[in-house]
Regions:
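Short, charged, low-complexity patches
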Residues: 48-49, 150, 154
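Structured core elements
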Residues: 2, 27-29, 38, 71, ...
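Generic, well-ordered alpha-helical scaffold segments in large soluble proteins
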Residues: 31, 55-62, 88, 127-130, ...
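A short, flexible helix-boundary coil/loop motif
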Residues: 134, 138, 165-173
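Short, polar/charged, Gly/Pro-enriched helix-capping and turn/loop motifs at alpha-helix termini
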Residues: 66, 99, 168-171
Length: 173
């Protein structure tokens, strides 16, 4: 793929305008007030469905509590992760199962709490877009995988400073 960056992978997006992109998979976790609490740049692309449970555990380690709600897109869904998340104490698991034929599951995915979780997830997609546009995550200017991790980390820190400043400004008015 790249002579200069041999760690680069092809990421199949399936979009009509850009079906393939090049880079690494970056996972972003966001909490209240649009603060990114964790990010990870993967050396090799794992299946999205294997990432959900570790995200809940990272949230618990960093913030000292299990999240009340977990929202993710359908790629993160697996029955095992959903059951394990609920066993850990997550009250609402808003992760759609697009392949379901169960009427019970379809009804669950139309409940208010599930839809609120998916709206939150849509907002998190906006955070990714902001990181790409405002903080230059479209293209990494540092060489190597460690350079990419550093580049993403600096973008996350910069965005968190902006979000904290906005939050404090709202509190003082």
């Amino acid at each position: 793929m790249s002579v200069f960056e041999p760690h680069t992978e092809i990421i199949r997006k399936g979009k009509g305008s850009k079906p393939n992109e090049f880079g690494k998979l970056v996972k972003i976790q966001e909490a209240e007030n649009q603060i990114v609490t964790h990010f990870e740049v993967f050396a090799e692309r794992p299946a999205d469905s294997t990432l959900l449970l570790s995200s809940i555990e990272v949230h618990q380690q960093r913030l000292g509590r299990i999240p009340r709600m977990v929202a993710a897109d359908g790629g993160f869904y697996s029955r095992e992760s959903e059951k394990a998340g609920q066993a850990l104490g997550v009250r609402w698991m808003s992760v759609p199962n697009k392949k379901t034929t169960s009427s019970e599951r379809k009804l669950r995915q139309h409940q208010g709490w599930f839809r609120r979780g998916q709206k939150w997830r849509t907002g998190s997609e906006g955070r990714i877009s902001v990181l790409k546009r405002r903080h230059g995550l479209r293209r990494c200017l540092y060489p190597g995988l460690d350079g990419m991790r550093r580049w993403v980390g600096l973008g996350v820190i910069a965005d968190n400073f902006i979000q904290m400043g906005c939050y404090l400004a709202r509190q003082s008015t």
